[in-house]
């Protein structure tokens, strides 16, 4: 154990935190690093991280933003306890570097790393940093981010780590055949997006009156039967595939000509990496409206249309899809422009920072 470099990774809660962290974890593991995870037992990292072959420790911590008075009064004591729990993990594992990539465990874990004298690397996936990373950026050894102007100060823009399989997808090399049906991928996240489920059946029927279009619609848990019935009622079932989840997103990205989706940081980064034109509808209740800021990167490059949910209706969606269906050259150009802002070596950049900091630490 003395000659093997060790990293403790803190990431959890959502796929937007966990999947980029897994990409870095796998890159370091391939180089012989021992990887251990710090998370919470009731969030998705508890299931996903062991599935990918990494050990995980849990601390007791919840979010404090927007909760009631009693929970806020109790929060300092709970945070102190979770910091102590994280220090115990660090004391036992003896990491050379700690990497925080978001989620409830990152706050206590980051403070514990500082108290333990372990270099702390932060990575912020969103264009607007979360409260925890804003605070931790003051004590971190290195601060990394995916987008320009995320932090004030000396943050390094490195992009968002994504799965190597998506980088190798090569979607942009596959020409769009003008006479083919427009292939629309609709992705609303694990719970689906109600507005997509409500609008797309009638939108598909309207566009189909003038253009050939096929739809692959991910509707979220418990919504499949109802959405399928709506497509069927409008005579569109033959050109639509409805699924609660899409397990193989690589296949979905490869299939699609355009995607209708939210604007989470990971989604925006993946869409750019595969060169897929997009219709972005930021989640309107995201903290600090960070999804709108995420979307601007692709929109300003010309690789996406921004459709704020507050003004989105069937007519606007029909109009955008008809434009794309009738102008395949513009669709191809959008994909190329999306690809132009992709950062394809983000995983390696984050890993390199961790390696550089660890190299300054003596082996135990």
Swiss-Prot record:
A GO BP annotation: cell division
Gene3D superfamilies: Glycogen Phosphorylase B (3.40.50.2000)
Binding site for UDP-N-acetyl-alpha-D-glucosamine: 14-16, 126, 163, 190, 246, 265-270, 291
SUPFAM superfamilies listed in its UniProt record: UDP-Glycosyltransferase/glycogen phosphorylase (SSF53756)
Enzyme Commission number(s) of this protein: 2.4.1.227
Subcellular location: Cell inner membrane
Pathway recorded for this protein: Cell wall biogenesis; peptidoglycan biosynthesis
Keywords associated with the record: Cell cycle, Cell division, Cell inner membrane, Cell membrane, Cell shape, Cell wall biogenesis/degradation, Glycosyltransferase, Membrane, Peptidoglycan synthesis, Transferase
Membrane topology: Peripheral membrane protein
Keyword Kinase: no
Keyword field contains Transmembrane: no
GO molecular function: UDP-N-acetyl-D-glucosamine:N-acetylmuramoyl-L-alanyl-D-glutamyl-meso-2,6-diaminopimelyl-D-alanyl-D-alanine-diphosphoundecaprenol 4-beta-N-acetylglucosaminlytransferase activity; undecaprenyldiphospho-muramoylpentapeptide beta-N-acetylglucosaminyltransferase activity
Gene Ontology cellular-component annotations: plasma membrane
Record's catalysed reaction(s): di-trans,octa-cis-undecaprenyl diphospho-N-acetyl-alpha-D-muramoyl-L-alanyl-D-glutamyl-meso-2,6-diaminopimeloyl-D-alanyl-D-alanine + UDP-N-acetyl-alpha-D-glucosamine = di-trans,octa-cis-undecaprenyl diphospho-[N-acetyl-alpha-D-glucosaminyl-(1->4)]-N-acetyl-alpha-D-muramoyl-L-alanyl-D-glutamyl-meso-2,6-diaminopimeloyl-D-alanyl-D-alanine + UDP + H(+)
InterPro entries, A to Z: GlcNAc_MurG, Glyco_trans_28_C, GlycoTrans_28_N
HAMAP family per UniProt: MurG
PANTHER family hit by this protein: GLYCOSYLTRANSFERASE, UDP-N-ACETYLGLUCOSAMINE--N-ACETYLMURAMYL-(PENTAPEPTIDE) PYROPHOSPHORYL-UNDECAPRENOL N-ACETYLGLUCOSAMINE TRANSFERASE 1
Family the entry assigns: Belongs to the glycosyltransferase 28 family. MurG subfamily.
Job of this protein: Cell wall formation. Catalyzes the transfer of a GlcNAc subunit on undecaprenyl-pyrophosphoryl-MurNAc-pentapeptide (lipid intermediate I) to form undecaprenyl-pyrophosphoryl-MurNAc-(pentapeptide)GlcNAc (lipid intermediate II).
Name of this protein: UDP-N-acetylglucosamine--N-acetylmuramyl-(pentapeptide) pyrophosphoryl-undecaprenol N-acetylglucosamine transferase
Lineage summary: Bacteria, Pseudomonadati, Pseudomonadota, Gammaproteobacteria, Alteromonadales
């Amino acid at each position: 154990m003395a000659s093997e470099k060790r990293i403790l990774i803190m990431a959890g809660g959502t796929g937007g935190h966990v999947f980029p962290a897994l990409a870095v974890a796998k890159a370091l593991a391939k180089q012989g690093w021992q990887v251990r995870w710090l998370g919470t037992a009731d969030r998705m990292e508890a299931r996903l991280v062991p599935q990918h072959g990494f050990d995980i420790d849990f601390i007791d911590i919840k979010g404090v933003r927007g909760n009631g008075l009693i929970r806020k009064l109790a929060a300092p004591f709970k945070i102190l306890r979770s910091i102590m729990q994280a220090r115990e993990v660090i004391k036992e594992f003896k990491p050379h570097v700690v990497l925080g990539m978001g989620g409830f465990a990152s706050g206590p874990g980051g403070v514990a790393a500082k108290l333990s004298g372990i270099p702390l690397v932060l990575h912020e996936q969103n264009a607007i940093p979360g409260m925890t990373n804003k605070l931790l950026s003051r004590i971190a050894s290195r601060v990394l981010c995916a987008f320009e102007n995320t932090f004030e100060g000396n943050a390094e823009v490195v992009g968002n780590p994504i799965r190597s399989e998506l980088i190798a997808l090569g979607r942009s090399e596959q020409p769009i055949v003008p006479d083919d049906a427009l292939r629309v991928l609709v992705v609303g996240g694990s719970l689906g997006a109600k507005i997509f489920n409500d609008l797309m059946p009638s939108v598909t029927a309207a566009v189909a009156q003038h253009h050939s279009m096929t739809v692959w619609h991910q509707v979220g848990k418990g919504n499949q039967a109802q959405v399928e019935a709506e497509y069927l009622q409008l005579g569109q079932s033959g050109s639509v595939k409805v699924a609660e989840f899409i397990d193989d997103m690589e296949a979905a990205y490869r299939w699609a000509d355009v995607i209708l989706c939210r604007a989470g940081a990971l989604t925006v980064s993946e869409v750019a990496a595969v060169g897929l034109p997009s219709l972005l509808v930021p989640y309107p209740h995201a903290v600090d409206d960070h999804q709108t800021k995420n979307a601007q990167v692709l929109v300003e490059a010309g690789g996406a249309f921004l459709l704020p949910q507050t003004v989105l209706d069937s007519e606007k969606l029909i109009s955008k899809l008809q434009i794309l269906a009738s102008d395949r050259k513009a669709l191809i150009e959008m994909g190329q422009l999306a690809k132009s802002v992709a950062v394809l070596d983000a995983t390696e950049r984050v890993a390199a920072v961790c390696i550089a900091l660890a190299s300054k630490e003596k082996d135990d």
